[in-house]
């Protein structure tokens, strides 16, 4: 059976050029980047090159890039570090109801253990947060606002420029989890007034276990761990040289291909959306119809259980998701889908389909042809069991 991978929001295949670049590091560069002899300096040069590649992709200075173990660590460093840096001055955090658990769970932990005031702003039924709602939630004690650029489940894009302008006017640090969007869409910190941005290599055909946090010059972020003082003391620990090289190469490739790939994937996305809505009764598109990631088609299919649909599609050769891969084993409906105002029973039928570089027209045709049969089977099984 030929497999069709349609879960690129969960992770992407490592680009062969990325894998080869990493293999060369493992094979030829044994040094520690902190060492002053030749082997160490060779490793340091590779880390510096990757830092330049990441910075160039988002319009930043290399000195503003901090390497991490991934998006979750970047989110934690942003929230915990920014709030700790302003402890005693301001203690408020504002975020939205559809953030990734790396933000929401961190915010809850800070509220419980660090006496942070935690405010959650609701989103509209299409997943967009009104900038006016963020403005209304900010008060004199607000230290940090965290709003993701693109939602990992429904693909909705947020108006970061407007929100950032509000934060800047109010003297509030602004963080955005851009894990899903950087690499797929243009993201330029020279035009978006954002202070902290989280990135993750494996979302744009790089390796798992490495990411970065953009820290705008002048933004205060306290370190969350102690040790050797790497990354200018912000993220101490010996650098993952091969992973960082992979991140840099993946970012360069994504930037080079972004324009044509985004347009191609958006066309495939729209074919999936139109096909599913036309052929699957009681299917509802989730997220904004146009302000969404170019590769994301997400739905609620009433009368189904998302996990059952995913497993049935798996048997037919398709890899899709019923939501975030980080919570796919959870039997509770997605907090993101519930935040859209969709009732709990319907929310159990969420389905996320995300295309990628390797997705073809034939793949999309096959998926659209298969899904209605799978949904009928799942609904029939559920009716018999009821």
Question: Where is each model-derived feature located?
Answer:
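Pyridoxal 5′-phosphate
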Residues: 1-386
